[in-house]
Amino acid sequence: GVPCLCDSDGPSVRGNTLSGTLWLFGCPSGWHNCKARGPTIGWCCKK
């Protein structure tokens, strides 16, 4: 999957760990949406 920035990772992608994974059709079972706003396409989810 494509890594994405969760709210808990910090305000920007620079110098922060991207702990989320981008899913186009919502988070799979057992995962949760970890970003309150965005991304434009898909959902940023983590286990």
Curated annotation (Swiss-Prot):
Pfam families: Toxin_4 (PF00706). It comes from the Eukaryota. One of its GO terms (cellular component) is nematocyst. It is found in: Secreted; Nematocyst. Its main location: secreted. InterPro entries: Anenome_toxin, Myo_ane_neurotoxin_sf. SUPFAM superfamilies: Defensin-like. Keywords: Cardiotoxin, Disulfide bond, Ion channel impairing toxin, Nematocyst, Neurotoxin, Secreted, Toxin, Voltage-gated sodium channel impairing toxin. GO terms for biological process: regulation of signal transduction. Belongs to the sea anemone sodium channel inhibitory toxin family. Type I subfamily. This is Delta-actitoxin-Aspp1c. It comes from Anthopleura sp. (strain 'Zhanjiang') (Sea anemone).
